């Protein structure tokens, strides 16, 4: 079949012809259960045939080259990296862990600014938080990945141990207000519930919260952040760790606008839109089975055209 289509310039998929054949096969029985079973069986046979045809066309060079370039390794030394927040932020720590302590990195106020920096060529890579083991996904990052033509090329898992940061000499009795990122406040909610008289105020970044406490020089204010943030802003670690999940970690993704992947990559993230019809997701997931991949996560998102985001890893 593939040889015929190569020779005659035919497309692999002829949807109308497949539907016609399935209708003919379904009409061989009057039983609705058997009809459905026969059609599903031959749908799978046709799908397997198409996958093999696409593979053969690729081997013959008919279907074109893969749009992503394979590279040996990301050059982590000769590049500019952007992250959201200020020095001492968890994103800053993740940046230094992935790109090295001498990384040529700079910070911007928002995650969107990170994406814009890549788009405009000001930065080669951005380091963005995408999920936390306690608080879940960072939905705004998924929205930005959908909006911008940027691609995930790596990840950094950062163990998160939140600390209560205050001016040197601050006692717990003096505290009236605690500042931090909403997720950090959530991850420390059990600890904060023991201090119900403390007002919780959200800021855009844990390190920015530390910076505010340092600049205001008010002992009634504290921040939740990293010990590194305390060091950068001259604060004292009053208590640590205060997050209730002692295995708390955040996954940061390394994003670029270049279509490339490392030779030893074993994870792929895919975002796609499906019609709201029976079997549409089922048919897409068949590609994961066919290519011997193990799906470790799937997420359905509402409000953006029924977007489904999946992540798969190659089976060992």
What are these regions, as identified by a protein language model?
Residues 1-316:
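Domain-level signature for soluble enzymes in the chorismate/prephenate branch of the shikimate pathway
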